[in-house]
Amino acid sequence: MSSNDNYIFELPIKVRDYEVDSEGIVNNANYLHYLEHTRHEFCHQAGFSFREMHSQGIDPVLRKVEIEYLTPLGLGEEMISKLNLVRQGVRFIFQQDIYKPDGTPVVKASVICVCIENGKLSRGDILAQRFEKYLNK
């Protein structure tokens, strides 16, 4: 996982009370939710609807997620979730990082998605067309 300063999308998020554990820090599983929420907001703002794509037989699915936990967050803390998108063959790689507002890195993640079309793995060309203006090549 590499750091990336060329983000195409940013989303501010605040830690809610039910996301922290008994130690008062964000439970590690919740970072998956933050990353997913960021991808979904990116897709929504880019004009994509998962429901619409599914009705057309197009389903982006997760293949692999790697997360490096760097700095904990606590109750009420704010964060900025950032995203970049790269295509490598059939894979769409979301390079996602979360930072504190002061720039302290919290999480670095790489999320690999592939595209299923009509129940079968595809090259993802339809998805690539939809993401074309956002893809870093």
Predicted regions and their residues:
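A broad, structural micro-motif
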Residues: 26, 60-62, 106
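Short, basic/aromatic beta-hairpin or loop at an interaction surface
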Residues: 53-60
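Short coil/loop residues immediately preceding or within conserved phosphate-binding loops
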Residues: 10, 62-64, 93
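Short beta-strand/loop turn elements enriched in aromatics
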Residues: 37-53
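Catalytic strand-loop segment that frames the active site of acyl-thioester-processing enzymes
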Residues: 1-42
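Active-site beta-strand->loop segment that positions catalytic residues and contacts the acyl thioester
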Residues: 61-78, 84-88
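HotDog/MaoC-like acyl-thioester-processing domains
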Residues: 3-7, 44, 74-75, 85-137
